[in-house]
Amino acid sequence: MPGIAEESIAERTRRVLEPVLARDGYELVEVEWLRQGSRWTLRLFVDKPGGVGIEDCQAVSRLVDPILDVEDFIEPAYDLEVSSPGLDRPLRKPADFDRYAGQRAHVKAYGPVAGTAPGSPARKNWTGVLVGYRDGAVEIDVDGVVHRVPHDQIAKAHLEYDFEADLRRKD
């Protein structure tokens, strides 16, 4: 199946399932449609306040499986997987950047972006502490300098778990 079909399946899955999951208190964070060996996999990443456990993944699977069967828009046989977004949770929506303000994150642009901070050279990657989302841009503090990255220039963004900070808190 070509890449465009993969995008269409993921997009349609999101459109169909997002409102259903929201009614049950879940956020559909990510949808992946991928081939693993000879099998196709539809992978859903879900979250809710307080986090997601194995019971939640099972409940979501039981909820969406019959809906996907009725909608019947996925042509090849596939395996359905439901998972939490994990420690490196993807950040996509403007609200994600505000929700996780104060946490460590990595932001990657499609290409070099100039003028993200005064005197800063064009760059493609930023790793630092999220400040939030304002006026169409993600603000991220990198070593004490706040950079503003236009949201429409972001290819990928995700949380980065700070193991060293966690170890310091436990000492």
Swiss-Prot record:
GO cellular component, one term: cytosol
Endoplasmic reticulum among keywords: no
Subcellular location: Cytoplasm
Protein name, per record: Ribosome maturation factor RimP
Family, per entry: Belongs to the RimP family.
Record-linked HAMAP family: RimP
Pfam families named among the record's database cross-references: DUF150_C, RimP_N
InterPro entries: Ribosome_maturation_RimP, RimP_C, RimP_C_sf, RimP_N, RimP_N_sf
Any GO BP annotation: translation
Role played: Required for maturation of 30S ribosomal subunits.
Keyword Cytoplasm part of the UniProt annotation: yes
Keywords on record: Cytoplasm, Ribosome biogenesis
Superkingdom assignment: Bacteria
